[in-house]
Structure formats: structure tokens, C-alpha cells
Design a protein with these regions (language model features):
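Conserved active-site segments centered on acidic
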Residues: 1-59, 133-138
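Small/polar loops that bind or transfer phosphate-bearing groups
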Residues: 17, 65-66
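Phosphate-binding/catalytic loops
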Residues: 62, 68-138
């Protein structure tokens, strides 16, 4: 979703997705997530889950976490990496720039119903757009 919104906005950037845990590595997104994403014009069925790696902190300028627990987990990983050049990625909450959600956690929809997936898609769209707008005006 973020990748597509950035492309539409004309921003040339690398966007990727990874989890802090290892329980979904190699799997496609949940079929409910695929269905709701498709209804919003996003094709996510070819995505494959991977786990965050130490290399990500050098490959990316910014790593966004969906919730406070993942942000803490990412900070722990970052703290374990030798940062001799001061160039490790910055960390932030995904909704940090979004005036609608103001740093709230993006809820995990997997234990919920269809409405939970719809809510998450809408939050991701809103927060991605907020980040894009913040970069365009910076």
C-alpha cells in the first residue's frame, strides 16, 4: 500500500515490509488481507513475509513500526548493532505523522473479523499518505 502510494506521489524510494517475529516467514499475506487490499486497488498476493534483519538498519533510512511493541523490538535490534558511522535507520511509529491517528498503534487484524481488516487498510492508507505529505513539504 505504501509502495503504491509513494509511486503515485512521484516519490522514488525503496519500500519493504518485514516482521519482527519469525512465525510467518515465507508465507503470503492472509487471504482476508489480500481480499481487502484488492478491494482498495492494491495487489499484495505476491508479497512474501520475511523477518527484519540487521542489514535493514543499514539499507533503509527509516523503519516504521505498526505498534509500540514492535517499535520496542526494533529498538532492541538496533541497539545490538554496532553503529560506528551513525548511519543506522531511524525508527518511528507508522501512524506518527497522521493527524487522524496521532501515533496510535495499528491494530493486528488477524484475530478479528472482516471489519478489522478493513479498518487496518484504511489506517495504513491514511498514515502512509501522512508520511508522504510530510516528505513532500519538508
Amino acid at each position: 500500500i505504501f509502495r503504491q502510494q509513494a509511486a503515485i506521489a512521484g516519490l522514488a524510494m525503496k519500500v519493504d515490509s518485514a516482521g519482527t517475529g519469525d512465525w510467518h516467514i515465507g508465507h503470503a499475506p492472509d487471504v482476508r488481507a489480500q481480499r481487502h487490499a484488492k478491494a482498495h486497488g492494491y495487489n499484495i498476493n505476491k508479497l512474501v513475509a520475511r523477518q527484519v534483519s540487521a542489514d535493514d538498519f543499514r539499507k533503509f533510512d527509516l523503519i516504521l513500526a505498526m505498534d509500540a511493541q514492535n517499535l520496542a523490538d526494533l529498538q532492541d535490534i538496533k541497539d545490538s548493532i554496532s553503529d560506528t558511522d551513525g548511519k543506522l535507520a531511524k525508527l518511528a511509529l507508522f501512524s506518527e505523522e497522521d493527524p487522524t491517528y496521532g501515533g496510535d498503534d495499528v491494530p493486528d487484524p488477524y484475530q478479528g473479523d472482516a471489519d478489522a481488516f478493513e479498518e487496518v487498510i484504511e489506517r495504513i492508507e491514511s498514515s502512509a499518505q501522512a508520511w508522504i505529505e510530510s516528505w513532500k513539504t519538508a
